[in-house]
A protein has these predicted regions:
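Residues forming the Rossmann-fold NAD(P)(H) cofactor-binding site
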Residues: 99
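Active-site acidic-Proline motif in GNAT/NAT acetyltransferases
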Residues: 89-95, 123
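Conserved hydrophobic/aromatic "anchor" residues
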Residues: 69, 92, 114, 130-131, ...
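Acetyl-CoA-dependent GNAT
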Residues: 4-91, 102-104, 108, 112, ...
Length: 161
């Protein structure tokens, strides 16, 4: 089941990220970079700021257990939904949870008459294949300097709704 979160529930996103990231990114980036990015992107102040700027957060939940999450933003002027975050607990991958969260964003895009979804994903992330299988295409390579000598080496991918 997918539930949208309120501002007071954003700690759930931080808690999930701290569980998911160290395992999911261990072969892509260093543990130091993982720690840096978690502190930068998933602290409560940053999550609240993003929420106030229009980012929506939703979790995938079974019984009382949170198994994954998505963050997205509707960009009406560009007729686009930007998926900022989509993560599933490593023990729950390949069970359709990621597809369910992605379908959730696609459905929101259709309801809001958006033309496409886009997202950024690390170029070495196995999720690239998941997105391609789902109908996303690679638009460009992006190398973003995020400070402290770290870079995000991503693909920007898009999906036409």
């Amino acid at each position: 089941m997918i539930e949208e979160l309120s501002a007071s529930e954003l700690h759930i996103i931080e808690d999930l990220a701290k569980i998911i990231w160290p395992v999911s990114f261990r072969t892509m980036i260093s543990q130091k970079q993982i720690k840096y990015m978690l502190e930068w992107m998933y602290n409560q102040n940053k999550l609240r700021e993003n929420y106030q700027n229009g980012h929506k957060y939703a979790v995938y939940k079974e019984k009382d257990t949170f198994l994954g999450f998505i963050s997205y933003e509707i960009k009406k002027k560009k007729s686009n939904i930007r998926i900022h975050k989509l993560y599933v607990h490593h023990e729950q991958q390949k069970k359709g949870i990621g597809q369910t969260l992605l379908k959730y964003a696609i459905d929101i895009g259709r309801q809001n008459k958006m033309a496409q979804l886009d997202l950024f994903v690390n170029r070495t992330n196995p999720a690239v294949h998941f997105y391609k299988k789902t109908g996303f295409s690679i638009v460009e390579e992006v190398d973003l300097d995020i400070g402290n000598g770290y870079f995000m080496n991503d693909y920007r991918m898009k999906f036409k709704i």
